[in-house]
């Protein structure tokens, strides 16, 4: 997400696995190239592009809808943290058969311990179709996985996630003759951003396509085209709890960090 944007269905990470192929090697490689550059049309869809887990409750739910033929789905939670072998979450049911044009509620359950209690954390919910066996031997079967972020918010956080984008600290600094944009997140929530644009004079640069900045994290980006003759402005889209995008902007300074303000909220 990319790490930042909350993808709608196939904008999420997907795993396309070649299960069985009885054709010649050259044909398989050619077909694989087409599959990797073509959006796979899955039969299942999720009711949200992100899942916010309120730590005041023992579980959070999301609905899987099957728009195709009968399918078996497998669901689990994992982490992108290096070295993490498991996370204190379970999904029930972990395996479910969903009939065509029907839906299945997935319950993500927290074990009660193991996650930070002073800030928001992120894990990933995976929902994967398991291809059904076919009678045809010369068959290429695909396992399509959809992956969305689960934002776990422990109970007792004295902060408002809606204000998180306005708490980011933006600053331009000069480092060895280069202009560097710094972004600091002093808050308790992750901020997912997209379409980050820096305007200085007649120049408009997009130093970041999309990203997510964690609580307490700072990111830096070198600005290639910068005009010091005018006041620079930054604008960006931030994804809220409902998966919609709100636009923020601020006037930058190289003397002190500044906050952005909301200028357009999604309906």
Residue map of PLM features:
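Terminal connector regions
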Residues: 113-157, 230-267
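Surface-exposed binding patches on compact interaction domains or structured appendages
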Residues: 45, 63-109, 194, 201
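Beta-sheet-dominated interaction scaffolds and their linkers
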Residues: 42-63, 160-175
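Intrinsically disordered, low-complexity Pro/Gly/Ser/Thr-rich segments with frequent PxxP/GP/PP motifs
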Residues: 87-115, 203-229
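Bacterial N-terminal signal peptides that target proteins for export
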Residues: 12-28
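Asparagine-centered strand-capping/turn motif at beta-strand->loop junctions
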Residues: 64-67, 181-187
């Amino acid at each position: 997400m990319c790490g930042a944007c909350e993808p709608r269905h196939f904008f999420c990470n997907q795993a396309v696995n070649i299960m069985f192929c009885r054709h010649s090697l050259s044909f398989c490689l050619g077909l694989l190239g087409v599959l990797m550059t073509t959006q796979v049309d899955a039969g299942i869809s999720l009711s949200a592009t992100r899942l916010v887990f309120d730590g005041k409750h023992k579980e959070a739910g999301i609905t899987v809808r099957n728009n195709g033929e009968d399918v078996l789905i497998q669901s689990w939670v994992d982490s992108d943290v290096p070295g993490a072998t498991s996370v204190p979450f379970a999904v029930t049911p972990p395996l479910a058969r969903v009939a065509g044009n029907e839906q299945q509620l997935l319950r993500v359950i927290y074990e009660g311990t193991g996650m930070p209690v002073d800030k928001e954390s992120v894990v990933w919910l995976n929902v994967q179709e398991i291809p059904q066996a076919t009678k045809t031997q010369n068959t290429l079967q695909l396992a399509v996985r959809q992956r969305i972020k689960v934002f776990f918010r422990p109970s007792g956080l004295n902060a408002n996630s809606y204000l998180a984008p306005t708490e980011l600290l933006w600053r331009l600094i000069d480092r060895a003759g280069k202009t560097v944009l710094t972004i600091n997140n002093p808050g308790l929530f992750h901020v997912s951003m997209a379409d980050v644009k820096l305007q200085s004079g007649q120049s408009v640069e997009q130093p970041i396509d999309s990203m997510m900045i964690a609580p307490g994290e700072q990111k830096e980006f070198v600005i290639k085209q910068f005009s010091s003759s005018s006041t620079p402005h930054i604008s960006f889209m931030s994804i809220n709890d409902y998966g919609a995008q709100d636009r923020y902007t601020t006037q930058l300074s190289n003397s002190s960090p500044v906050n952005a303000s909301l200028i357009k909220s999604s309906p």
